[in-house]
Design a protein with these regions (language model features):
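Alpha-helix termination/capping residues and helix-transition junctions
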Residues: 14-17, 129, 206-207
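Glycoside hydrolase catalytic-domain groove-lining segments
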Residues: 83, 87-98, 102-181, 200-201
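Conserved, well-structured beta-alpha core segment at the onset of a catalytic domain
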Residues: 1-17
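Polysaccharide-binding and catalytic clefts of secreted carbohydrate-active enzymes
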Residues: 19-107, 111-123
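Well-ordered, non-membrane alpha-helical segments in soluble/globular domains
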Residues: 2-6, 91-94, 189-198
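Short, solvent-exposed loop/turn and secondary-structure capping segments
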Residues: 33-38, 147-148, 174-176, 224-225
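Aromatic-rich peripheral "rim/lid" segments of glycoside hydrolase catalytic domains that contact
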Residues: 39-54, 215-239
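Substrate-binding cleft of secreted/luminal carbohydrate-active enzymes
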Residues: 20-22, 26-28, 167, 181-234
Length: 239
């Protein structure tokens, strides 16, 4: 599937494009600390349950046929959860990075735009450190970047560079409802500018941050509904 997808999406023109930076392979995949418990709670007919049970049995030296599921799940440790998360992340990123580079060796593999709980999961960063050229992070719910988080990303990934692949804040004075999206809301466009300056100066504190992408070029939808996510209005006018 991944090989066919890469061949369909990545054209010869893209492969030879000197202005193309690289590729995100997905967006905000639901990496979870408790992935092992979640997989073991699936229906027994689900292939994901079956493969997870096989992995768990092998890790713990158990016979699949004699496992009591309630006892097994109750006895899972944080180490078990972490090892499984690293296992599935390695399986996924190992496959997609290999096929991506086979299809286009000229450009960067930029990860999968981590978001939410994923930005606090050490095993995912450890795996991305092995496969990604740059780690992408959709960084929200922060008025100022947390230096401790930026440093964790650097250490966990083995000094792999990261890029903030999505972030923004909306202004109340735009006239939009601003009810959708993860970005915060401030009073005015001047405040948006102050937020931008403060946030980017914070990112520059990290030697591993190589840049950032504001979420959208222009706002989404039209008045009165919509969100002030862009640099320009929906009519392509600067604020």
């Amino acid at each position: 599937f991944c090989k066919v997808r890469a061949e369909e999406k990545i054209t010869e023109e893209m492969i030879q494009d000197p202005t193309l930076l690289g590729y995100f392979v997905d967006n905000e995949l639901p990496w979870r600390k408790d992935a092992l418990v979640r997989y073991l709670s699936l229906d027994k007919s689900d292939i994901n349950f079956q493969k997870t049970l096989e992995w768990t049995a092998e890790e713990k030296g158990l016979d699949v046929e004699s496992i009591n599921m309630d006892t097994l799940k109750a006895g899972l440790t944080d180490e078990d959860q972490s090892k499984f998360l690293k296992h599935i992340a390695d399986k996924y990123f190992g496959i997609v990075s290999k096929l991506l580079k086979e299809r286009d060796p000229n450009h960067l593999f930029l990860g999968s735009r981590l978001h939410g709980q994923a930005i606090r999961l050490k095993p995912v960063f450890e795996v991305l450190g092995d496969y990604a050229d740059v780690i992408s992070i959709n960084y929200y719910h922060r008025w100022t970047p947390r230096i401790s988080e930026l440093e964790n990303w650097r250490m966990w990934s083995g000094d792999k560079p990261f890029v903030i692949s999505e972030w923004y804040v909306k202004g109340e004075d735009s006239g939009y409802t601003n009810t959708d999206g993860a970005g915060g809301v401030v009073k005015t466009q001047v405040d948006r500018g102050r937020f931008y300056q403060n946030f980017t100066l914070g990112l520059l504190e990290s030697k591993s941050c190589i840049g950032w992408f504001w979420h959208t070029y222009r706002d989404t939808k039209d008045l009165p509904k919509g969100s002030n996510k862009g640099f320009l209005s929906v009519r392509y006018k600067p604020f």
